[in-house]
Design a protein with these regions (language model features):
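Non-ligating segments of multi-cofactor redox enzymes
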Residues: 1-184
Length: 184
């Protein structure tokens, strides 16, 4: 996050790699603004504490995923090989319960198949020793992917920042480096 400029190259690369139609995205970049302007009553001068930052987000492959708990057919499941959460489209009935349960708004309906779909961290690329397309495409190198223990050792364990929900709710496999001034 300290590096993300909001260019959305990761979003476009993901859409292209997964051949997603208009309106369906597996990634998003949320723009956040905080602070405001205030007038000094004594001098009339205006002062600001405005800050803006971008939050690139997709499926966080949570340790306690709400989407998996509500899936009526168990189509949402964890891969044994690497712990990624994926959707088995043969089992999915497109109920949309996973989308309603996900605090990050990740699962989306594929209108052509009437099945749910979401970021799978480019599992096919990972299986061939490659990084997810969002990681490779980011011109600022703001996105990293790897074993969560290694990322936490490198960057710390913070996983909550506005506008994201409290990390204690689903325990996302996510590490956030907040912009200066928002570290606390």
């Amino acid at each position: 996050m300290t590096k993300c400029t909001g260019c959305k190259t990761c979003v476009v690369a993901c859409k292209d790699a997964h051949n997603l139609e208009v309106g369906r995205n597996f990634r998003k970049v949320i723009e956040m603004q905080t602070g405001g302007w205030r007038q000094d009553r004594a001098t009339g001068a205006w002062h600001q504490d405005v800050e803006a930052y971008y939050v690139p987000i997709s499926c966080n492959h949570c340790a306690d995923p709400a989407c998996v708990k509500v899936c009526p057919t168990k189509a949402h499941h964890k891969r044994d090989t690497d712990g990624l959460f994926v959707i088995d489209t043969k089992k999915c009935v497109g109920s949309g319960l996973c989308a309603k349960a996900c605090l990050y708004g990740v699962p989306v309906l594929n209108p052509a198949t009437r099945k749910m779909s979401k970021c799978d961290a480019c599992a096919d690329r990972l299986d061939h020793g490659l990084q997810p397309i969002c990681v490779e495409s980011c011109p600022q190198r703001a996105i990293e992917f790897g074993p969560i223990d290694e990322l936490r050792k490198k960057y710390g364990d913070r996983a909550t920042i506005a506008p994201l929900p409290d990390a204690d709710l689903t325990k996302p496999s996510l590490v956030i480096r907040p912009p200066k001034g928002l570290e606390a």
